[in-house]
């Protein structure tokens, strides 16, 4: 400490940078993220995490050994152009190696099955989850599951049901991307940046999701108030905008037969909120414990997300139409779950 600072602050002042530059292992904590599934989405999730410098170590898994080897090589070849010298590990199908991770992203799926409906992957992705879920948990994993495989809400419910894992540590990407699409569509109508629009899609990550327009705000003012004050600028067809947000992914799919960038960035956003303990409010799929009378399934509502996973779930002021739609959306998730034998304990235990 300089003589001047010593005189001003006192000899016993603990100068915050007194130990700056010391080599102390306690000052550095390695951030590790595993990604299961190296298809279109999983590979782009890994790339987003790498490009944004979110993880210090990436652990990639896939049942296709050749595919995961190629993805690992491609990412390693990018290391000269990204923020940090991230370690990239090829785990093949050795899911137990993910037990060291802070976050495991589930991106296992088969995009061709979801060509017209996210429910198309129902049996494939739930079967895939059974191949790794307990292996990861039984190996000692104590981090956060971020699941983006579709149908997202069903797969999240399955992960919780099969493993008995703390549901707060299972986060579905859910309507996070759909909410971004909603804000973008509203932005196009009213000329306000989507980053300044607070609006959410809720319910199932699928065709039954609902836009929560009654609770939507800009600068703390309800969208309905702004519309009343200046209808020329703020009035628009809510149902049309909701439909555009709901089907945005299929517009992307129509021309390239997959969705990649936005869903990968959405997953990376959740990972960043966890690793940085942001306490960020994001629309995500989480276990219902009585919200609007719903319980026992995962679905999307605005969630506070930090290092421990889902810290709090917010309910919104919904219109009668929105509330009815939310309940119908939850029922659709239950109908999908009812098709799966793991939900029938007797049938599952008989296997």
Regions found by a protein language model. Give the residues of each.
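C-terminal substrate-binding/catalytic lobe of Rossmann-fold NAD(P)-dependent dehydrogenases
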Residues: 163-169, 178-320, 324-351
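Glycine-rich Rossmann-fold phosphate-binding loop(s) that bind the pyrophosphate
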Residues: 38-39
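N-terminal Rossmann-fold NAD(P) dinucleotide-binding loop
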Residues: 42-43
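Conserved N-terminal Rossmann-fold NAD(P) cofactor-binding segment
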Residues: 10, 63-101, 338-342
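Rossmann-like NAD(P)-binding element
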Residues: 81, 86-144
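Rossmann-like NAD(P)(H) cofactor-binding subdomain of soluble oxidoreductases
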Residues: 118-183
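A short, basic/flexible loop-to-alpha-helix module at the beginning of a structural domain
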Residues: 8-30
């Amino acid at each position: 400490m300089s003589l001047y600072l010593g005189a001003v602050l006192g000899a016993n002042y603990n100068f915050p940078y007194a130990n700056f530059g010391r080599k102390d292992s306690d000052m550095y904590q390695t951030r590790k993220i595993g990604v299961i599934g190296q298809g279109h989405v999983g590979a782009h999730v890994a790339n987003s995490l790498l490009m944004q410098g979110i993880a210090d170590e990436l652990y990639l898994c896939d049942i296709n050994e050749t595919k995961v080897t190629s993805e690992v090589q491609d990412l390693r070849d990018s290391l000269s152009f990204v923020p940090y010298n991230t370690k990239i590990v090829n785990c093949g199908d050795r899911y137990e190696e993910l037990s060291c991770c802070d976050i495991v992203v589930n991106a296992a799926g088969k995009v061709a099955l979801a060509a017209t409906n996210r429910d198309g992957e129902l049996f494939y992705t739930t079967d895939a989850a059974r191949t790794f879920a307990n292996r990861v948990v039984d190996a000692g994993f104590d981090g956060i599951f971020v699941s983006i495989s579709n149908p997202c809400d069903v797969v999240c419910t399955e992960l919780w049901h099969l493993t008995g894992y703390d549901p707060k540590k299972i986060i579905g990407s859910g309507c996070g991307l759909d909410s971004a699409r909603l804000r973008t569509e509203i932005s196009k109508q009213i000329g306000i940046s989507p980053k300044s629009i607070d609006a959410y899609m809720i319910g199932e990550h699928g065709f039954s999701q609902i836009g929560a327009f009654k609770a939507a705000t800009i600068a703390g003012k309800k969208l309905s108030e702004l519309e009343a004050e200046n209808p020329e600028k703020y009035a628009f067809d809510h149902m049309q905008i909701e439909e555009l947000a709901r089907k945005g992914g299929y517009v992307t799919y129509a021309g390239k037969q997959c969705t990649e960038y936005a869903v990968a960035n959405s997953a990376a956003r959740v990972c960043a909120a966890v690793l940085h303990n942001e306490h960020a409010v994001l629309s995500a799929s989480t276990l219902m414990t009585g919200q609007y009378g719903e319980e026992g399934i995962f679905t999307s509502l605005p969630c506070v997300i930090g290092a421990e996973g889902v810290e709090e779930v917010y309910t919104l002021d919904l219109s009668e139409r929105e509330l009815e739609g939310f309940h119908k959306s939850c029922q659709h998730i239950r109908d999908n779950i009812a098709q799966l034998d793991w939900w029938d304990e007797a049938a599952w235990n008989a296997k």
